[in-house]
């Protein structure tokens, strides 16, 4: 586990050169006393502008999507935890280091914090396909966040741009989803579908009850 801007970030233990073997996406043995709903956000194509078929390998290539800061701030102001759940296979492929990924997230968090829109938890699967238990559409990252933050999944939402994001929510028992349309042809139904992240704030105000 690493700390980025005061936020615990889950990552592959082997890449941190720690001796004891653990299952990726480590679980805590305790839960906070209160239960709070969350908004789970995919990263590329939702929080930041999509890199297309490639990867965001450097912090200077990471650009927040128009409208996303306002949407994230609204979620926090209305009583939701903010959790980032992202697949970053570029680390597993050796295209970037874990340190580079951490730097991207640290800079992202610093920018978001200036607007009261920072994430409460960041969960990144950096493994190659077929080599772990946390790669989407597995619900593992959501379950880890639930245990770490005491989340009420039955009152939570997920925002993503790919079928694997929506299916991840279904597999975790997160009942409400918002799809951001992309070049991926949708095959899994979402609760709401938007053309871009710029429409997200309006959708939240019209459809999402305050959690306080």
Q: Model-predicted segments: where are they?
A:
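Extreme N-terminal basic, low-complexity initiation segments
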Residues: 1-11
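Asp-based, Mg2+/Mn2+-dependent phosphohydrolase catalytic module
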Residues: 20-34, 43, 99, 103-120, ...
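Active-site neighborhood of HAD-like aspartate-dependent phosphohydrolases
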Residues: 24-83
């Amino acid at each position: 586990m690493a700390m980025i801007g005061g936020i615990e970030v889950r990552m592959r233990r082997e890449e941190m050169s720690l001796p004891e073997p653990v299952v990726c996406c480590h679980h805590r043995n305790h839960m906070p006393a209160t239960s709070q709903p969350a908004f789970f956000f995919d990263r590329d194509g939702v929080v930041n502008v999509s890199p297309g078929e490639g990867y965001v390998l450097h912090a200077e290539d990471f650009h927040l999507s128009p409208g996303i800061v306002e949407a994230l701030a609204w979620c926090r102001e209305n009583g939701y935890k903010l959790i980032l759940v992202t697949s970053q296979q570029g680390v597993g492929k050796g295209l970037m280091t874990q340190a580079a990924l951490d730097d991207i997230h640290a800079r992202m968090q610093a920018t978001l914090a200036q607007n009261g829109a920072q994430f409460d938890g960041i969960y990144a699967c950096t493994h190659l396909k077929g080599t772990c238990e946390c790669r989407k559409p597995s619900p593992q990252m959501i379950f880890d966040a639930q245990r770490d933050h005491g989340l009420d999944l039955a009152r939570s939402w997920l925002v993503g741009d790919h079928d694997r994001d929506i299916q991840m929510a279904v597999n975790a028992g997160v009942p409400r989803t918002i799809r951001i349309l992309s070049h991926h042809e949708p095959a899994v139904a979402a609760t709401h579908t938007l053309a871009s992240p710029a429409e997200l704030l309006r959708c939240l105000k019209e459809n999402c009850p305050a959690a306080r």
